[in-house]
Every structure is written in structure tokens, then in C-alpha cells.
Amino acid sequence: MPVIGEKFPEVEVKTTHGAIKLPDYYVEKGKWFVLFSHPADFTPVCTTEFVGFQKRYDEFRKLNTELIGLSIDQVFSHLKWVEWIKEKLNVEIEFPIIADDRGELAEKLGMISPYKGNNTVRAVFVVDNKGIIRAIIYYPQEVGRNLDEIVRLVKALQVSDEKGVAMPANWPENDLIGDKVIIPPASSVEEIKQRKEACEKGEIECLDWWFCYKKLD
């Protein structure tokens, strides 16, 4: 099973948009992607999730991020389900869904629990534009995902990469420091001195030398 920091395994998959090679299909376009699995088509919780992902698709695309679903179903099942969602709920699913009918990719990614039958759990893999796995989340089959948290996670990772900072709990609505971001702790005596000086000048704020934070530039 892959872990955070590893490259996403190279694999060609069947989808509702045709064959796709992962992660190259997105990496070559310079895009991040969120791969998420669902237990089965034509199930209530999964339907609410797909509608929710589609409603937030523009938010993901503004973050240069694509969506791709997966379940252990055949492609015709995906196509019929997507058709049903459009006809009954007036929501058109625009992103591809992987038809992992043999469960090979799901098995490789650790999406199948031996205690939950042959269907996937609700896994989420966030992969950056270099094809590196940046985050992995697992939800049980009986609980739908918090989709706003997945948007927040992608945004936080991208800001962290760009600015070299860390994000506090519930960023940008942290209980202690609000929408400010955390400066990585000093790793030398000289850095501690520099942090204290920067704090005295009002350039940053510190609760102590190891807990400093600032507004985003």
C-alpha cells in the first residue's frame, strides 16, 4: 500500500471518459488530482457524495485540481448511474469514474477492508502535479465524507508548498491564530535569535521561539 510522499503507482485504468494513465494523465498537464473511491454505484450515501463533489468541482479546478472517482463496478454501471443522477437530480457529473471491475487498483491502494466485504471503503488520495501522494484519508462505508475538508486540504497543501509554512488546526479559522500561518520551528541557536528579533520588530508574532506565526504575504 502506498504512503504519503511516495509517487502514485503507474497504472492504466478504464473510466467513463475512456482509458487514462495515472498519474501521467494529470502530471503532464501540470495538475493535481483527487482520487476518491466509493463502495458502489446506485447507493444513497455515494450519490450524495458525487453530487457534492460535482457542486464543488469549480472550487477544485480553481486550485488546479481534477477529480476522479473509483469503485469496483463495470463501466456501464457507472454510465447508467451518472445518467440517473443527471435525469433525477439535475446534476451532471463531469469528472471521470474508474471502472476497477477486478479490484486490482483498489487492492493496490489499500481501499478494501477484509472486514467490509469486497467493496471499497471511502478512500481519498490527494496527488500533486509531480505525481506524489500528499494526503490519504479513509472514511468507513457508512459515513459520507466532509467534502469541504478535502477542498481545504488541497488549498492548505498548495499554500504550504508555495509559502514554506504550516497550517494550524481548522485553518483558516483556527481558535488561536485565526487565518494566520505557522512558521516552521527554528532549528539552530542563530535562528532562534532571528525569530526573537523579528518578533520584536513586529514582523512576525510568537508565543515562544518555537511557536511563531504570521499573516500570509
From Swiss-Prot:
InterPro entries: AhpC/TSA (IPR000866), Peroxiredoxin (IPR050217), Peroxiredoxin_AhpC-typ (IPR024706), Peroxiredoxin_C (IPR019479), Peroxiredoxin_TDXH (IPR022915), PRX_1cys (IPR045020), Thioredoxin-like_sf (IPR036249), Thioredoxin_domain (IPR013766). This is Peroxiredoxin. Homodecamer. Pentamer of dimers that assemble into a ring structure. Keywords: Antioxidant, Cytoplasm, Disulfide bond, Oxidoreductase, Peroxidase, Redox-active center. It comes from Methanocaldococcus jannaschii (strain ATCC 43067 / DSM 2661 / JAL-1 / JCM 10045 / NBRC 100440) (Methanococcus jannaschii). Thiol-specific peroxidase that catalyzes the reduction of hydrogen peroxide and organic hydroperoxides to water and alcohols, respectively. Plays a role in cell protection against oxidative stress by detoxifying peroxides. Pfam families: 1-cysPrx_C (PF10417), AhpC-TSA (PF00578). PANTHER family: PEROXIREDOXIN 4 (PTHR10681:SF171), THIOREDOXIN PEROXIDASE (PTHR10681). The keyword Protein transport does not apply.
